[in-house]
Amino acid sequence: MKKMTINDLIKWKQEGRKFATSTAYDASFAQLFESQEMPVLLVGDSLGMVLQGENDTLPVTVDDIVYHTRCVRAGSPNCLLMADMPFMSYATPEQACENAAKLMRAGANMVKIEGGDWLVDTVKMLTERAVPVCAHLGLTPQSVNIFGGYKIQGRDQEKADRMVKDALALQEAGAQIVLLECVPAELAERITKVLDVPVIGIGAGNVTDGQILVMHDMFGISANYMPKFSKNFLAETGDMRKAVAKYIEDVANGVFPDDAHTIA
């Protein structure tokens, strides 16, 4: 696989070519994903739940993400590697720059931050200092205590309009990817069409430019429940490499997610 860049993803969006992405946390699985030409990987703070056994992502530290970013980069030298900025690691633009530098030095190509237009100054500062940003909207797991649980976001018109405005503001500030989690497919389509940057969805229908799954859900090994929008591709194929290949193929062909794995 050739070295992936954000320019490749922008070109794919312009061409209407959909792409699959996954979380990854270690070198072995990163190598597996690269062998199947997975273009983008995310070292997600979901590791707090799937690796550390926590109930949410809040206990994850910057050092945790740095460690796993190094591991994933060792296994996948050519993917576009995103790294999550954990809870309260970007409360101010200055703090965000300090912590993002650690992730970039560990091998990340981009950092992912959760939140709306209050992040505009942070995104601007990061971008001006050569740190690419993925902006995460919708169900942002670090805000679980504000939301009162893991709930679908953007169902009413006012909140949907606000999310569109946030997406545009973050793109204007310099965000190069927007990730939408657990939003109605109609809203995801609206945001995908209005933005010039690639939009990655999870639980947001199949109209986004890309899809992402938590690795453990893809292989059916999550200790907790399986979200409606996830699919166990290993059960269908019986082989991890084939499962990854099937996921990539189904996303590229618009087969996944289907209605059964889409939030109305």
From Swiss-Prot:
Pathway the protein acts in: Cofactor biosynthesis; (R)-pantothenate biosynthesis; (R)-pantoate from 3-methyl-2-oxobutanoate: step 1/2
Similarity comment: family membership: Belongs to the PanB family.
GO biological process, one term: pantothenate biosynthetic process
Residues given in the record as Mg(2+) binding sites: D45, D84, E114
Protein name: 3-methyl-2-oxobutanoate hydroxymethyltransferase
Classification via HAMAP family: PanB (MF_00156)
SUPFAM superfamilies found in the cross-reference section: Phosphoenolpyruvate/pyruvate domain
